[in-house]
Amino acid sequence: MGLWKSSPFLAFSILVLCQAGGLQAAPFRSALEGLPDPTALSEKEGRLLLAALVKAYVQRKNELEQEQEQETEGSSITAQKRSCNTATCVTHRLAGLLSRSGGVVKNNFVPTNVGSEAFGRRRRDLRA
């Protein structure tokens, strides 16, 4: 997977090396000076190689995206309630637990004032 993330860099590097090979001011002289260099690519061959690399990269990227979509469609994602630990939320959860519990506690249970306006900010009287 890491190879495909670096493929654009790899393709660009190959292109730069091909172009830089043709622009050398002082070419490397070897013992086989009379023979053509088998590693040198013509401009047309370089473009074909680059096009093939880009095409292979795009195909592989599309395949990976399709695999990821299929994995996410097949997985069962369950919704979970967000956890809240403020005093209001804890009080509300305790009140709910007490109201669901049976026995003596239920008979003597007096509901508490819980909710968004129970603690903290309260509505002001507009008459004053």
Curated annotation (Swiss-Prot):
Residues 26-80, 125-128 form a propeptide. Residues 1-25 form the signal peptide. Its main location: secreted. Residues 74-83 have a biased composition (Polar residues). One of its GO terms (cellular component) is extracellular space. CGRP1/CALCA is a peptide hormone that induces vasodilation mediated by the CALCRL-RAMP1 receptor complex. Dilates a variety of vessels including the coronary, cerebral and systemic vasculature. Its abundance in the CNS also points toward a neurotransmitter or neuromodulator role. It also elevates platelet cAMP. CGRP1 can also bind and activate CALCR-RAMP1 (AMYR1) receptor complex. Belongs to the calcitonin family. This is Calcitonin gene-related peptide 1. It comes from Canis lupus familiaris. The lineage of its organism: Eukaryota, Metazoa, Chordata, Craniata, Vertebrata.
